Amino acid sequence: MYYWFHQSFYMAKALPFIGGWLADRLLGDPEGWPHPVVGFGKAISLGEKTLNKGNDRAVKGGVMALILVAGTYLLCERILALAGYFHPIVASILSGIGVFYCLAGKTLVKEVKAVFEAVDRSTEEGRKQVGRIVGRDTSRLSPQEIRAAALETLAENLSDGVIAPMFWFALLGLPGMMAYKMVNTLDSMIGYKNERYLEFGQIAARLDDLANYIPARLTAWLMLAVSGNLNKMDFVKRFGPAHASPNSGYPESALAAILNCRFGGTHDYFGKPVEKPYIGTNERTFTTEDMLIAIKTNSNAELAMGLIVCLISIIIH
């Protein structure tokens, strides 16, 4: 009896993560609900408008990024500590809510399904739908390019939106998870190599590269493992580093290996063509079956990572 009570106590340490994770799997990101990332975005926007001018833009942007990331970590840690003074259950509930808001597994799957359904109706509908989840110019994309963009984004955001947040939760708890989301939001807003953000956002972009270095490679390994394709790791090692990003190429190359297809090529960003190396060699037409395989791979990789995080939480505590 004591053994099972003892085990249940330590299992309870993983419950906030499990609760938040299951909530994301069930609810996704309901429209109209308040979201901390919206607050992150407002803080970044205010800082950028105030500081991105004059001299020393790289320094000012770097200081802003570091303050926002460290501030997010410390604020989250303090909120949980104060909640724990009232009752540990209050802290656990807040932690579970935080995990829910930091994960984006179901939402992205929903968006990718919507892209494939839209492009089956018309190319124009597909362009509009894929424009919701990619940064490239979608106005001239072909149906093939629309489907490819959706699949590439699904693979990349499995790392950014699911595996990486879970990784940082396992390492540093909810404060680490929230700090990662701030890093990711900074990169998505000011981490571009255009005239406006080239200097100001360079530290934010480097922070994102560092924060995703291990998670991106772990994501690729998980994708291959759950799909029974670990023998294709050499493919990932070959094409993963070819991507302009030091991280995005790994989950994308894993999916290309699984689907035996080719990603990459030239796309327009902010009115300028950007040439991306090809990932894979088999240029073929994408189908709904590819989307279903990719979604199944994502879901299984997320499940595997979630179980790993639960195990780590129990062992550590």
Where are these regions (language model features)?
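Glycine-rich phosphate/dinucleotide-binding loop and adjoining beta-alpha-beta core of small-molecule
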Residues: 188
